[in-house]
Amino acid sequence: MALELEVVKTSGKPIGKISIASSATIKDLKKEIFKKYKLGVERQSIRNGPKGKDEKDSQEINKINLETPNTVYVKDLGPQIGWDTVFFLEYAGPIFLYGALFLFPHCFYGGKSLEQGRGHNARDIFPFYIFPVEQINKICGGSLIKVHDNAYYAGILWTIHYGKRILETAFVHRFSHGTMPIFNLFKNCSYYWGFAIYLAYHVNHPLHTAPPTWLFYLGVFIFLFCEVGNLSIHILLRNLRPEGSTVRKIPVPDSNPFTKLFNYVSCPNYTYEFGSWVGFTLLTGCFPVFIFALAGLYQMTVWAIGKHKKYRQEFPNYPKKRKAILPFLI
């Protein structure tokens, strides 16, 4: 049995009519709208009313409670970009921007103060920079490209963190949504890239005072511990979702001890992420890093609470003692 549906924009402007099987899904409807009216599938948000919520692609049309009989509403989400592309740009930017302040200190801090630097060649961490580093620094008034121990090791750990994120995007993450509005690319990149410049300026500053040795090693341990924990959670979440599907299951710990945090929070990947930046704060002794950690905690808490609520709504047997992101607190 076929359904005759009136397709209307959420603004109230009619688009046209679609004839489709009553057993068809929202995904099928999107494809028909694309065929007939050339509105890209990824740009469509199908709703049961002008102010209704976005219907899932797997939802059958005949099971939707339409506000107006035989009428569906479409919101154009605008130009889209792939999630993987967004993540690659988000995470590659901080490596290159941090590297710029690391490799060209004379251009940002002046030449004379850098003569007090000691120890390590900046090229060791960022060998992929194709620019004539020594020549550019000479133009800016100096030639010595040596950095103090704290900045050197912080640069290594910074690169490990964002390099890990890039590799996870390529080989680990499975996205429930293929695309996102292209506007979000500028918003997300502004956040990551802006903080990369802000942190790099302070951590690499020749007058930056490194923390005590014991605090540095404590910070390194916390950072690396949380990086491994974060990766462990991402691998577990990948294994929960079969490739090519949007299946959702209750995440529970596996044999990896780092996943035991699922006993306490719904989004332990965010917990570990925050922990990494607490560790980076300690190992650098840099207050701007702590500001970045708190900014990240705020945003991740918003995301975690949203995901936590979805889990509890979707799964009646969801563990009641779990918090969203911080054990026993939030």
Predicted regions and their residues:
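Transmembrane alpha-helices of multi-pass eukaryotic membrane proteins
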Residues: 81-98, 148-161, 179-192, 210-223, ...
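Short amphipathic, charge-patterned alpha-helical segments
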Residues: 19-48, 69
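Interhelical loop segments of eukaryotic multi-pass membrane proteins
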Residues: 107-133, 241-248, 315-320
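Hydrophobic transmembrane alpha-helices
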Residues: 100-104, 208-330
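Internal transmembrane alpha-helix with an interfacial aromatic "cap," most often the third helix
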Residues: 151, 155-180, 196-206
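Juxtamembrane membrane-interface segments at transmembrane-helix boundaries in membrane proteins
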Residues: 72-82, 117-149, 209-215, 248-258
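Short, contiguous acidic and Ser/Thr-rich linear segments
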Residues: 10-28, 53-56
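Eukaryotic mixed-charge, acidic/polar low-complexity intrinsically disordered regions
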Residues: 23, 50-75
